[in-house]
Amino acid sequence: MRCFALVMSLVAGATAASAQSFSVPVVYRKLPNGLRVVVSENHAAPVVVVEVMYRIGFRIEPRNRTGFAHLFEHLMFQGSEHVAKFEHVRIVNENGGVLNGSTRFDHTNYFEVMPSNALELAIWLEADRMRSLKITPENLKNQQDVVSEEVRVNVLNQPYGAFEWLGLPQKANTNWYNAHNFYGDLSDLQAATLDDVKQFFETYYAPNNAVLVVTGDATVDEVMKLAEKNFGSIPQRQLPARPD
């Protein structure tokens, strides 16, 4: 019994030490314009991850705007006021980084993994497209076609490929937001006007509808100064009620 108690105490101590060694420091802040900032410092390597998450995904799209969340995942790489078309990708790659974006049920996210000495560059790139995305007739038409083709190839033309996105939600739910076609009705997508798309951007791509997350080799003070400098002047907007 004494041996068993000793073993159990050692296991408990090891477990506690292990849990302590894996604790992750996280700091939450918010700018006056509503942008939430989450920072987790880890100085093990000179690398940072910068991510901006917007509260708009497949499930939150309003009626007659299905497919818009996914459309914007593509439009966000078409240039902004100070960054030409496709330059966002080139700039990140030439500074030793990688990037991507994705659309989920309740959010769309964009991220860069960069050397930590390029932290300000990554934050500036994200702020520039939140502030001044280039929504032009050419960019819209091009990405309408790209997204439509992606849906056809990856979903509609795949055996059972449509089930998760087009079939299951309607069978599992009655609320329209949870039951509609999550990849979007292609007729909604192709009917989108420039004004429709601009209004969607102005509604959902707002600082008070977003979270800036920075993890890695950066301090909280450094991140907050850069967040205020680059995002602080972007005005917050009136947000629609969130669906059930």
Where do the language-model regions lie?
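Active/ligand-binding-proximal structured segments within catalytic/core domains
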Residues: 34, 43-92
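An aromatic/glycine/proline-enriched structural segment found at the starts
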Residues: 174, 207, 211-244
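Short, surface-exposed beta-strand/loop micro-motifs that present aromatic residues
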Residues: 26-28, 36-41, 198-203
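Bacterial N-terminal signal peptides
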Residues: 4-14
